[in-house]
């Protein structure tokens, strides 16, 4: 499956839907979606990872990038996180910087 990062907005929320594998080759597309989401000025960023099948270290760095790019008062939620992806996020210690809902 090809990687897809799709941004949608509404009601003060920017949602980025991720599908496929998030790695060094695909992280720039996620970075672009984050930049676009920040530009909307949304008070909440939702990252829908329900179709994300794999996350590599570059994907983890992209999550850190997201946390750094948004304003401090912007809530970032990771939703639909699959068990394999959640395991990697937890091993990296990134589960404390985000509101995470597993699938």
What are these regions (language model features)?
Residues 24-97:
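Amphipathic alpha-helical interaction surfaces in cytosolic regulatory modules
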């Amino acid at each position: 499956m090809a990687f897809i990062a799709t941004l949608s907005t509404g009601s003060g929320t920017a949602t980025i839907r991720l599908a496929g594998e998030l790695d060094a080759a695909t992280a720039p597309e996620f970075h672009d979606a984050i930049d676009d989401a920040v530009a909307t000025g949304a008070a909440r960023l939702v990252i829908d990872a329900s179709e994300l099948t794999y996350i590599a270290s570059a994907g983890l760095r992209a999550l850190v990038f997201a946390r750094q790019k948004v304003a401090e008062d912007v809530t970032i939620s990771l939703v639909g996180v699959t068990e394999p992806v959640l395991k990697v996020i937890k091993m990296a210690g990134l589960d404390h910087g985000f509101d995470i809902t597993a699938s």
